[in-house]
């Protein structure tokens, strides 16, 4: 049996402000730093150990990983940074307040943009300052692969190459893997691992800063999965994530 641990970054400044973040590189709040530190302590106290970590190229996930490494005394851990683990790109919604957007377009439309599998938000114009074209962290990524918007289906397509080419082989080789990423890149992995339908994925909410453990068989098929920590608090956190896109 193999174990894989996934963790969504702690609360970010734009999580707190209820804004669509996507590829915008905002940092953690004080609460987000604390959530990441608590996750590291929980993993250490629960007896977890890791051989390699994967994260995105966005500082909220990277800093979350740093806190976990620090609390586990694993600062030496090899880390793979990949743009493929970035949050889903929210296109023209990037930076907008979720509740205000819902008040303007309606709860149902915003829920479709946020949570449906194959409907992306309106795309950025290629000349928009929010594009990633001139960002040095994407200098080696072909321009045509840099998104101007994404639905979850697009995010799955972006995430799967690093799973197939690097993460899955690492797990099968016996390495203990930790992934510190984002709500939708984790949803993409969970959809694949659990074979969740396109319609059911709409209801899946990933809380900030809570370790999600997968126990996998020899074919990397899930035996079971569970969150570490206070289950009542985790359920409340998931409900809060679900409520973010509503106007009320």
UniProtKB/Swiss-Prot annotation:
Entry keywords, A to Z: Gluconeogenesis, Glycolysis, Isomerase
Binding site for substrate: 8-15, 21-22, 60, 87-90, 98, 114-115, 183-184
Pfam families: His_Phos_1 (PF00300)
Single biological process term from Gene Ontology: gluconeogenesis
InterPro entries per record: His_Pase_superF_clade-1 (IPR013078), His_PPase_superfam (IPR029033), PG/BPGM_mutase_AS (IPR001345), Phosphogly_mut1 (IPR005952)
Enzyme Commission number(s) of this protein: 5.4.2.11
UniProt pathway: Carbohydrate degradation; glycolysis; pyruvate from D-glyceraldehyde 3-phosphate: step 3/5
Site (Transition state stabilizer): 182
Active site: 9, 87
GO molecular function, one term: phosphoglycerate mutase activity
Gene3D superfamilies: Phosphoglycerate mutase-like
Cross-referenced PROSITE patterns: PG_MUTASE
Reactions accelerated catalytically: (2R)-2-phosphoglycerate = (2R)-3-phosphoglycerate
Assembly description: Homodimer.
Function of the molecule: Catalyzes the interconversion of 2-phosphoglycerate and 3-phosphoglycerate.
PANTHER family the record matches: PHOSPHOGLYCERATE MUTASE (PTHR11931)
Protein family: Belongs to the phosphoglycerate mutase family. BPG-dependent PGAM subfamily.
Stored HAMAP family: PGAM_GpmA
Protein name: 2,3-bisphosphoglycerate-dependent phosphoglycerate mutase
């Amino acid at each position: 049996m193999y174990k894989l641990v996934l963790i969504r970054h702690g609360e970010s400044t734009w999580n707190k402000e209820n804004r669509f973040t996507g590829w915008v590189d905002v940092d953690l709040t004080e609460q987000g730093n604390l959530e990441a530190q608590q996750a590291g302590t929980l993993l250490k106290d629960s007896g977890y150990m890791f051989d390699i970590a994967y994260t995105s190229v966005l500082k909220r996930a990277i800093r979350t990983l740093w806190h976990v490494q620090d609390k586990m005394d694993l600062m030496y851990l090899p880390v793979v940074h990949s743009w493929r683990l970035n949050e889903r790109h929210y296109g023209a919604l990037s930076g907008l307040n979720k509740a205000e957007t819902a008040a303007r377009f309606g709860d149902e439309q915003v829920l479709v943009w946020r949570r449906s599998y194959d409907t992306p938000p309106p795309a950025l114009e290629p000349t928009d300052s929010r594009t990633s074209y001139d960002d040095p962290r994407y200098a080696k990524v072909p321009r045509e692969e840099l998104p101007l918007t994404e639905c979850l289906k697009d995010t799955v397509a972006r995430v799967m190459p690093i799973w197939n080419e690097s993460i899955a082989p690492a797990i099968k080789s016996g390495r203990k893997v930790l992934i510190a990423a984002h709500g939708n890149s984790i949803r993409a992995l969970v959809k694949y691992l659990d074979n969740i339908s396109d319609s059911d994925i709409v209801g899946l909410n990933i809380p900030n800063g809570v370790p999600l453990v997968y126990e996998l068989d020899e074919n990397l098929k899930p035996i079971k999965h569970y969150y570490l920590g206070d289950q009542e608090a985790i359920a409340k956190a998931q409900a809060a994530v679900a409520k973010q896109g509503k106007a009320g």
